[in-house]
């Protein structure tokens, strides 16, 4: 997320839809993280600091990834290994050999590793799910859980009420989530016609929609069919040119790696 929208670029992006006015919900992918030109994290991804920065810049919410330690503790990390995002806690040295999360107990994880950051104050332990949700609640923004860990849904519902987003694949799993939550559900897809995806969403019920990284799926006709039927359409970390095209084609959610200029931009307004 080291690419920053200038105000001008952001305005060009937001007015690309002609003839209508609508809101697009903007979420920060793994929080609002950033890197130096040399590639070292400034604000670490999937960190409490990245949640706070997303709130400061006005995102409606953040997306985060939930995985389990060896002893079953839910923590926020995208990769199977710690190597890309963490360093040794003792001397801040890089991890030379692969360090797999599944091989570490929660105590080992918190004791031996910190998130990479050029700012020593942000070299914090990899956060738990509860720590991220607590910060979202404190900052007043919505967590989007990209998770296959069932217990994470239950914790989110307990801590956030219905003010969270369940984002994963599997219609049957989402049907079970709907039994205890009225949260927004975004079903991860890779294929299917608009009609096929509408049928999937009907079987889930409530406020729900689809999300994909396959930007070629999101033609104007495809997006219109979904939104006319009352469903959400999320563009998930598209390349910049395809993000602009998707906004023009009618998406309702934007999950992005690009940094918005500071300010209360809870939603992109198109017209």
Q: How should these model regions be labeled?
A:
Residues 2-10:
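Sec-dependent signal peptide recognition
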Residues 19-271:
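Phosphate-group recognition and catalysis centered on beta-loop-alpha active-site segments
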């Amino acid at each position: 997320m080291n690419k920053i929208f200038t105000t001008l670029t952001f305005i060009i992006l937001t007015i690309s839809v002609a003839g209508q006015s609508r809101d697009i919900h903007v979420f920060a992918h793994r929080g609002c993280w950033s890197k130096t030109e040399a590639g070292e994290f400034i604000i670490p991804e999937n960190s409490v600091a990245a949640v706070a920065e997303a709130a400061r810049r006005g995102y409606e919410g953040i997306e985060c990834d939930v995985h389990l330690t060896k002893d079953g503790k839910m923590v926020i990390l995208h990769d199977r290994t710690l190597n890309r995002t963490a360093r040794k806690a003792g001397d801040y040295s890089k991890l030379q050999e692969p360090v797999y999360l599944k091989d570490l107990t929660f105590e080992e994880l918190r004791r031996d590793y910190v998130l990479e950051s050029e700012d020593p104050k942000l070299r914090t332990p990899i956060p738990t799910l509860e720590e991220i949700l607590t910060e979202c609640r404190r900052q007043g923004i919505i967590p989007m859980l990209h998770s296959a860990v069932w217990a994470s849904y239950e914790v989110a519902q307990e801590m956030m009420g219905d003010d969270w987003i369940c984002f994963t694949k599997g219609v049957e799993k989402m049907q079970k989530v709907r039994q205890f939550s009225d949260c927004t559900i975004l079903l991860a897809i890779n294929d299917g016609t608009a009609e096929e995806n509408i049928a999937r969403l009907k079987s889930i019920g409530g406020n729900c929609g689809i999300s994909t990284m396959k930007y070629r799926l999101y033609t104007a006709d495809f997006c219109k069919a979904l939104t006319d039927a009352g469903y959400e359409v999320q563009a998930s970390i598209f390349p910049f040119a395809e993000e602009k095209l998707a906004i023009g084609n009618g998406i309702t959610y934007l999950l992005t790696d690009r940094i918005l200029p500071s300010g209360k931009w809870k939603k992109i307004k198109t017209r």
